[in-house]
Amino acid sequence: MLKIWGRDTSSNVQKALWAAEEIGLDYERVDIGGPFGGLDDPNFRALNPNGKVPVINHDGSILWESNAITRYLAGLDPSGKLWPTNAHQAALADQWMDWCNSHLWGPFPTVIIGLLRTPPEDRDDDAIASANETLEAEWAVLDAQLAKMPFVAGDNFSVGDIPAGVFAWRRYELPIQRNDLPHLDAWYARLKERPAFKKIVMTPLR
């Protein structure tokens, strides 16, 4: 049995939930973090000493860090549909997962917190605009990759698309300036056709 700790509005938790849905894995989810609190509870800290979500328990095996969890869940699928069989494509999937953490995650909280969780009169509009400008430059890097292939690692959807897809939903839903990135647009349209993406990621931002 798979148990996932984390609120369903968290981008990092959504990675794990999306992967589980893609492979049809049953799971139980526990609300924790954000408005639910509980991250400093000793029982939760025993699961993840960092006090962050998501955390999973799969048949007694505990794991934290969203990308590690997403990779792990993808590996549970006997069909292997989320992992490219080609070694280079598998490495590309890994590459773009890591790229999200190193290039998108840094400026994203400034935009999310500024627009969703800060009253208009208290917002630092210059900081939000600067962070979004940085993000748009990063999205252009992914757009260039998607000019060569329909998904980040090749012709088929893979685990490598999941982290970027979670961030992309926020890019397209937030009231921000977006540059013209046609290949990113086409990729995002393909993601929106996936039932698991619709169920897990396409939810109100808050």
Show which residues each predicted segment covers.
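A general structural signal for well-ordered secondary-structure junctions
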Residues: 26, 50-53, 79, 103, ...
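GST-like domain detector, emphasizing the conserved glutathione-binding G-site
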Residues: 1-9, 14-129, 143
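GST-like fold's C-terminal all-alpha helical module
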Residues: 92, 100-193, 200
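Carbohydrate-binding/catalytic loop surfaces
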Residues: 117, 205-206
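Short, cationic motifs built from Arg/Lys/His that form the positively charged side of catalytic pockets
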Residues: 14-17, 190, 194
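Conserved beta-strand edge residues that scaffold enzyme active sites
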Residues: 34-35, 160, 205
